[in-house]
């Protein structure tokens, strides 16, 4: 018992020290337990919140991320619509081309690798291998067909530039994407692919090559806009940028119509991002763009451009020229030309017109001078100590040159219309009832208005004349007095009604809205006087055309348009552009009087506009020679001039209007539009009228014989006018050099020859005395077909016998070499 008692007291036993955790009291354990539980709960809350965010709140976003990693979304490009002329001839189309690119970083043949002491890998460029690959690719790029490698001139500048482009791109061995070439055709693309494939096979392991490696070159599909006729209707068609987006002309104004809507293909992709063949791929088909069918006719456009180009060169026109052929009843534009212009296939290239552009810029220093910009604020100019702008000593006119050529002169530039506007002033006076065609005013050669004294051209005194004679003689003083009778308010009301205070609404971009005119309360005595004969209000050529059209079509102002209809890819008409009559400006009876006076102006080759006359047609017209008051003056101190002419036909019931404008002609002989612009309009009419089937004057001249005039030493344009008046056709033959402003040195048939009405006279403006052609065999052909065959050979034709029969004989031996213009008589039966 004693022993047990001692044990209880601890005697004879060693007590073991307690561990730290055993020393924790109960309260501490509870705190720790609570904290641990809180940590677990907090962690769970974080997880739950994350799950909530990922799966519920932002679930859609994360599912999209996951889908993007698993799915490949590829754009399917829509094919841009085409542009056709009125006859269905393609003016703009899209073709498939290829861009060639490379991955130099993956092209191990272009570099060698080594390891530094710090174990980093270093690449060393191999210029020899890069040169070999660059040469192989360049030869194929310049071959055109991928095969004619031997035909490539490796010493040419073109080769050097292309080679350097490829070499520089491939030498970027740390880059994964470099472009070697763009817009490559399929044949060249396949040739490059074959070359690269063969090269890589020759340099793979086991091939025995000195260097083992590969070059990574790939292709990507692209598109290219093509304009098959080059610099043709360029200002109307416009062009697209590198991405295929319309940036000018119809390409811009109808961008959404032509572009279509891109499609998409969604497929699964593998770990490296490539598409996996999958039957469950989702495709949203692209909707190809619609096509534009124009009212513009390539044949009419070609005629207008040809004669305009000749006139610009012959008359040394400094600020370009424009021509318009328009249906006066519908507003449909059959031709619209600005010359010189550009090739929409290469719109950035102005080299063909560089000399012309340099002269134009130099002639207008106030308009085109480039000044230095402030380094701190590019919107401000740098000024000298006197506060004057500092001229850039090394100006870059690239943008200026392109802007000049790209502008559609018919709608983007303002000019003073001059005497063509007298047609409108006449309509104002007639329609308002303040005058009739027989109303007279006196022209004494000078007329004072306020502090200004006005004169007619050449200070002529026309005496007392009526409205018809005033229009024919282009009497400024008559129209000043007529304008005064109309009055400022009424003058402005008609000016506004004829559409001069607003855009025409033509379906082309960049039509200027910065009209320059006087409102009724701004039309003081002087402003009204100058406006009455077209020398105070600035308008666009197309505004003048629509106003003249309204004056002769019964008084209706129509909206001009270039697009006739829109079709889908199958040719079905989606939309048809009808005639839009904006309002009636003058009465039918007033319009009838205007038509009579305009025909009197041309006068069958005897009036003031006689140089626009073409035998066999009833033509009305009016010339206008105006001063460009807002332009830099000529060296002689005189204002620069604008020569214009507006013609309508047939005069009794007009269908078409032909308008020509030459901005700042520098013809040493004259400034008068009746001599410079009227012949251009007449020449256009001489070919356009028969092509369009415009009604003739009804007189049968099939049996008429005409005497060929002597045209030697006559300016070619005047020679053509003489032929137009006599009812003879003309053909200006190509000269050995550009001599469009030269005199006629040879003609055939010769002067004095008696020829049938409608015979073609061939004109030469160089020292060559004639061009030979071979006589075709027309035996057994119908008279009409024989006539066409002979015309194609440059020969004239006289039909004898039964015109409904076939050719029995011909006067010139088959195969004989004769001068162009020779008359071949065929006998039919």
Annotate the PLM regions:
Residues 1-392, 405, 414, 489-496, ...:
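Periplasmic/cell-envelope proteins involved in peptidoglycan metabolism and beta-lactam response
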Residues 76-79, 86, 93-97, 175, ...:
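Extracytoplasmic
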